[in-house]
Every structure is written in C-alpha cells, then in structure tokens.
Amino acid sequence: DLPGMVYAAAEASPIHWQPWVKESREMARKSHKLMLVVIAIPQQASCALTPSRLSSDPSAVAEINRSYVPILVDGDAVRELGILTADLCSEISSGLHFPLMVWMTPDCDPVAWIPLVPNESGSVVELFSQSHGMVGNMWEEDHGYVSRNSRMDQENRSARIRIRASERELSAEPAADSLRALRQLTTLYD
C-alpha cells in the first residue's frame, strides 16, 4: 500500500502497476522486458486519469502486461524521477508536462518518452499504441542494441545537462531579483 492519489488511482487497475523499487527493476531485468514508467504528480487531475484511461482499453492492458513491467511513479514521492521528467521534456523541446510516459531499460536508461498532454490530439491509448509499435519492435529485434544505445544516449544527455547547469546565469542580486519576481507573480493575482 503506497500513499497518495497517484497510487490510489491505479489500485483497482487491470494493469499490473508496480512501484519504483529495486524489486520492480529486477523483475524487468529477469524477464528481459522494458519498464513502462508513468511519472505523474497528484496536483494535476489528468495524472490520476491516465492509469484509468489506459486501463479502459483491453488491448492496451493486455499489451502493457505482456510486453512491459509497468511502473507507476508519484513524481512528488520519487523526486529523482520528477527531476528527470524536466530534463527529458527539455531534450525534446517540450515544456514540462505530467504525466510522462517513459520506456526504460532494466538499467534505468530512458529509451523513449512522451508527455501525455491533455487536450492534445490523440488519446493516451493512441499515444501508447503508436509508441509501443516502434519501441516494442526495436526491443524485440535487438534488446542488446537498444540497451547499449540507451546507455550511451543517457551518458550524453547527462553531459549536456551538466553543461546547461554550469552555463546558467546566476543572479548578481538574488534577494532583489527574488523580490522583483515575487511582486510580478503577485500582480498576476491582483
């Protein structure tokens, strides 16, 4: 029993959601499956709906349970994945969006990811099906290649993230800038 709305929304799901724990990653390794990780945050209503939308399609449920170790993550509770979401969205020139569906190797290297943006074309099930067709086929054809390539991509991504972090311009007057930003935010609500 895990606390929070994100996990409660998936309790009765026919998808065999697992928590983000070592045993789940080991399950993926032993079964030679990718992990299908859905990172959500409870503050967004669409996050609670995503597991139920996926669960409403019997063919998606069967494919997820057969092909992946499905993992549901509360981005607030598992902060490292919440932070990873920002970096992954940045990599595809997208704003930060939750929930984020990520296909990961058993070594936790992202293979592919897609933000599940509400009110955009395509339902959650359609987005899953399209991506599954591509990612699932690549994994079936040569999971060794996918693992090596994803590891290399993750190393390169980490290097880019470190460079971006070191290039960030820090404020010369953090207190004054913070106060100015707070005043600007306050005017939005006046």
Predicted regions: what they are:
Residues 1-190:
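Replace the tail clause
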